[in-house]
Regions:
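A structural signal for well-ordered alpha-helices, especially hydrophobic packing surfaces
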Residues: 36, 108, 112-115, 119, ...
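Short, extreme N-terminal leader segments that mark the start of a protein/domain
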Residues: 1-49
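Gly-Asp-aromatic-enriched flexible segments
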Residues: 39-78, 82
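Hydrophobic/aromatic-rich, well-ordered segments within soluble, folded domains that form packed cores
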Residues: 124-150
């Protein structure tokens, strides 16, 4: 990836430009789709609420996600040990999670649409496009970081602290 540059133009306004390698473009698009799929699955499995259907307000899950990546993308609204009124965390999550997922999906969709299946490796964003782009990239980073942490935990459980040696050992087992 080339470093980002800022270009000012009278006709096009301010633009932020970079050039991705083809593999980077493909991996970024695939990652955006993977995170979107997980978020959509979470939204689809939300319990149906009769009051929400009557009022038109979407209702989400009351419990935090079990998937570590989703748990980081959709964290609790209260910290462990903070004083809270019974049910506040669940109610807050239930009322806000769907909107948070919707915003994250729109940002990820922007990246996917921009890159497209045969999209350009040249990225040129307006000032208005920078925020959704960076939000989506950050969500992808957070999700994959949580997955990597789980992978490292699995390695420690199985006794291999070095991923390279673990992979090498697993290759010889088969």
């Amino acid at each position: 990836m080339q470093p980002w540059t800022k270009k000012n133009s009278l006709l096009r306004g301010t633009r932020f430009n970079t050039q991705l390698e083809p593999l980077e473009r493909e991996m970024l698009g695939d990652s955006a789709v993977a995170v979107s799929d997980k978020l959509m699955e979470r939204a689809r499995t939300a319990p149906k609420d009769e009051l929400a259907e009557m009022t038109g307000m979407a209702s989400g899950h009351a419990d935090a996600p079990k998937d570590p990546g989703l748990a980081r993308l959709l964290p609790s609204f209260f910290r462990e040990g903070d004083e809270e009124v019974d049910g506040d965390a669940a109610l807050t999550r239930q009322l806000n999670e769907t909107d948070i997922i919707k915003t994250k999906l729109m940002n990820l969709r922007f990246v996917v649409d921009y890159l497209g299946p045969n999209g350009s490796v040249n990225v040129s964003l307006t000032q208005d496009e920078v925020h959704p782009w960076l939000s989506a990239i950050n969500d992808i980073r957070i999700y994959h970081s949580a997955q990597f942490d789980e992978f490292k935990k699995d390695l420690d459980v199985e006794g291999a602290s070095d991923p390279v040696s673990y992979t090498h050992l697993r290759a010889h087992e088969t």
